[in-house]
């Protein structure tokens, strides 16, 4: 959306289960978006090419339920309610205060200067781990790995700064023939 419409807005969720992808939410854009094509290409790129992996990019069902963003949310995103109220009373506002927010608020991280990616160290490390996990799978280093993988990194902070990595968890989908000893 943003490539073709820099002012576009997307508030969508994706649910994936065996053989089915559901994309739902709200989009405001002047451009066309081939959602089923994007879903299939993303699954293919991630390595979901066999129903034995839980989903096959070529044969899975793709259900799309997307509507235009509501006018209330659109107005809130365009200009914060507080700014709209203040503009009516005194006509002045700070640019940073003018930005509104939509109705979704699940967060994994936040912008900060802990890393070059401007994300918390926990998020940056997790992203690097799952990128390496994906590379190892795609290059066949561990031929039993399947596409689903995730990580969580816990960092201890002291005085607001990262002090040490406390815990690293990596979960990787794998074939049923792999023993626990092989995974350890």
Tell me what each language-model feature is.
Residues 29-43:
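Active-site-surrounding "flap" and adjacent substrate/cofactor-binding loops of secreted or lumenal enzymes
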Residues 1-3, 25, 118:
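Short, N-terminal intrinsically disordered low-complexity segments that are rich in Pro/Gly
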Residues 18-20, 37, 44-184:
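Glycine-rich, mobile lid/loop segments that gate access to catalytic sites or pores
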Residues 10-29:
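Short, charge-patterned binding micro-sites
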Residues 1-11:
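N-terminal, positively charged regions that mediate nucleic acid binding
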